[in-house]
Amino acid sequence: MLNRIIEHMNAHHVEDMKGLLKKFGQVHHAENVAFKSVDPQGIVIGYNHNQTLRIEFNHEVKDPKDYKNAIIELCQSVEKTHDLKGVEEEVKAFKESFDSVCLATLHPNGHVVCSYAPLMSDGKQYYIYVSEVAEHFAGLKNNPHNVEVMFLEDESKAKSAILRKRLRYKTNARFIERGAEFDKAFDSFIEKTGGAGGIKTIRAMQDFHLIALDFKEGRFVKGFGQAYDILGDKIAYVGDKGNPHNFAHKK
């Protein structure tokens, strides 16, 4: 079976392998490209006479019969990497799947606070709901333009601990007075979550504040060789500037 895979890749998929070398190894001019081996963790491609690059699968292949699908998934990822419209839709859906968000804030005394807060949205604007007694409140109040938020995939849903999908934004925080905007945001939150677990109770607590999150530039990482910079409504593939990682190309 392994010999058939190697023969097939070398006979029919040299261009696909060149795409993989470019995406995962920053190899822009590859010659004498050859598929060398495959194992449950990944593949090895040879190029330029005496060099090789190992590329890991997104998840371990348990059955050798599934090598074909794992290799196809790798090859298809090259084209999908440049499907920026698809990435834009994925970013939107990823954000909408969260009811809380990770925060990094700068406390007035200079130390950084890492925390999380419940997340609300009216369909266009995102908000967090924060108590004055929370440690991150002082940072949001005193340094509202020095905030980062992160949407981080649940580890139990990720293909690997090092492949957790994440979306991070530099963010401006704006405090919203209680009124029409407050009610619209909180009504949407209750509708989405069902309002259980104390959510309806904290709505009336006056030491809690609704804070709008105005996202600035960000980065979306969805897997190996799949990082994207975000600025407003524009998305750019990081790899277009050259792969940022250094690889050990074996001879």
Swiss-Prot record:
Catalytic activity: heme b + 3 AH2 + 3 O2 + 3 H(+) = biliverdin IXdelta + CO + Fe(2+) + 3 A + 3 H2O
Phenotypic consequence of gene deletion: Deletion mutant cannot utilize heme iron for normal growth.
Induction (free text): Down-regulated by iron.
Main location: cytoplasm
Pfam families: DUF2470, PNPOx_N
An annotated GO cellular component: cytoplasm
Keyword ATP-binding: no
Binding site residues for heme: 245
GO molecular-function term, one example from the UniProt record: coenzyme F420 binding
Keywords: Cytoplasm, Heme, Iron, Metal-binding, Oxidoreductase, Virulence
Residues annotated as signal peptide: none
SS bond partners: none
Impact after mutating residue 245 to A/Q: Increase in activity
Compartments, record wording: Cytoplasm
InterPro entries: DUF2470, F420H2_bilvrd_red/Heme_oxyg, Haem_oxidase_HugZ-like_sf, Haem_oxygenase_HugZ, Pyridox_Oxase_N, Split_barrel_FMN-bd
PANTHER family the UniProt entry points to: HEME OXYGENASE HI_0854-RELATED
Protein family membership: Belongs to the heme oxygenase HugZ/HutZ family.
Assembly, per entry: Homodimer.
Its biological purpose: Involved in heme iron utilization. Catalyzes the degradation of heme to biliverdin, with the release of iron and carbon monoxide. Release of iron from heme may play a crucial role in the pathogenicity of H.pylori.
Record-given protein name: Heme oxygenase HugZ
Organism: Helicobacter pylori (strain ATCC 700392 / 26695)
Lineage: Bacteria, Pseudomonadati, Campylobacterota, Epsilonproteobacteria, Campylobacterales
